[in-house]
Amino acid sequence: MVRVRPLWPLAAVTALIAVPLLPLAATSQTPKYGGVLVTSPLSAAPSLSPHEESTVAVVQQASPCFNNLVYYDPAKKQESVDTIIPELAEKWSWQDGNRNLVFLLRRDVKWHDGKPFTSADVKYTFDMVRAAPDAKGRLKVNPRKLWYENIEAIEAPDPYTVVFRLKKPQPALLPMLASGYSPIYPAHVPLAEFKNKCIGTGPFKLKENKPGEYVEYVKNPDYFVKGRPYLD
């Protein structure tokens, strides 16, 4: 289980600064299943919808629920695109003079409600974020629309292939897709539900959200990374 509780006192700041040192001492130990993790960001997130927020708090509090197409390898320093690895994507390639970014997706991923993850979800998410004319969802607040203004079109030729067609080459697109603000949303879930709820593909499922108090997650038994997560 994971519980995220906002903390305000100065003592909380000190505790948070000390936290990154703990895993270093534990790296030689064999991971064990079970247990509870309590984390304490310095503020409460306004919602559990990263695409509609700009605070670090929303990433901290919503990230257990979600996955990206790609992400930065947590075992390496985030120094270049060479540290970006697949997550919901199995692999990717640049084509047509780096104007097309093609992703091949994992086939073993389910949303927390049991529905399969497909390319339609990726297209839905980024058509919505870039405010495409034919987008099936609209964000009330869209702080990162400019990130994706170079996208000409997003195509889903089959359930496990996604093509980002660009107006011109954009090497920075991959790092933006690896950002904590770039999770994939389910196309079948109304966007309004993400105000206080969360249906993702991540290692933890939302159990309870008390805005301003805590967000509690439990282990996702169907998580696509076998044997993970370790926490209950």
Write out the residue ranges for each language-model feature.
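Gly/Pro-rich hinge or "lid" segments in bacterial periplasmic/extracellular proteins
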Residues: 71-79, 170-232
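Aromatic- and charge-enriched surface segment that lines or borders ligand/interaction sites
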Residues: 90-135, 163
